[in-house]
């Protein structure tokens, strides 16, 4: 049995697990903590010369105050289009079009809204955990497919290693969740 095939299973598991964690972090960055965060809007698509362009490519997004974002378009003629795209995004923020720039004012989160956000955070967390577990199952199946070529002891050893990798990524997801939950519950 060529050990490189087994190593390929482990490296694929690691790579896919890292992608799950990265996507999880990206999805969490979209959850508003009551503080202005450019991540919330940077990928909103704006119609610009009949093409849909991410907001971050056609404007400068800054945080002048903790609960405010300021969008300064590079081309002032598209301010109305940006405003329209922001309205369509249903951001739950006050949008003020000042002519050549747009301000987004984020309301302070009340306790009820914080609890709702923690619930949605928990949904994202569970989805990420399930994805990691599915990757574990996939890797275990690949290892078992070699059972005619490797011993039962080796299969158990490889499954244990897969479980260890799985546990480390679940732990990362849980840490990220705890951090985000603390941010959400901070007043």
UniProtKB/Swiss-Prot annotation:
- For this chain's UniProt record, which GO biological process terms are given? translational termination
Q: Can you say where in the cell this protein is located?
A: Cytoplasm
The UniProt keywords, alphabetically, are:
Cytoplasm, Protein biosynthesis
Provide an example Pfam family for this protein: RRF
Gene Ontology MF terms? ribosomal large subunit binding
User: Which is one Gene Ontology cellular component term of this protein?
Assistant: cytoplasm
Q: Major place of localization?
A: cytoplasm
InterPro entries per the UniProt record, alphabetical:
Ribosome_recyc_fac, Ribosome_recyc_fac_dom, RRF_sf
Purpose: Responsible for the release of ribosomes from messenger RNA at the termination of protein biosynthesis. May increase the efficiency of translation by recycling ribosomes from one round of translation to another.
Which family would the database say this protein is a member of? Belongs to the RRF family.
What the entry lists under NCBIfam families is as follows: frr
- Please state what the protein is called: Ribosome-recycling factor
Q: Which organism is it from?
A: Mycoplasmopsis pulmonis (strain UAB CTIP)
């Amino acid at each position: 049995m060529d050990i490189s095939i087994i190593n390929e299973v482990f490296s694929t598991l690691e790579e896919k697990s890292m992608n799950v964690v990265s996507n999880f972090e990206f999805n969490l960055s979209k959850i508003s903590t009551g503080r202005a965060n450019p991540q919330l809007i940077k990928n909103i698509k704006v119609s610009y010369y009949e093409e849909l362009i991410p907001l971050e490519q056609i404007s400068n997004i800054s945080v002048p105050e903790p609960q405010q974002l300021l969008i300064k378009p590079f081309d002032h003629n598209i301010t109305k289009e940006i405003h329209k795209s922001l309205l369509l995004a249903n951001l739950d923020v006050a949008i003020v079009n000042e002519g050549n720039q747009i301000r987004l004012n984020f309301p302070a989160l009340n306790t009820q809204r914080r609890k709702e956000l923690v619930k949605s955070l928990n949904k994202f967390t569970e989805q990420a955990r399930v994805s990691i577990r599915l990757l574990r199952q996939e890797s275990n199946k690949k290892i078992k497919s070699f059972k005619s070529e490797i011993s039962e002891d080796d299969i158990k050893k490889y499954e244990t290693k897969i479980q260890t990798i799985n546990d480390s990524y679940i732990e990362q997801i849980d840490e990220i969740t705890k951090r985000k939950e603390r941010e959400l519950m901070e007043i």
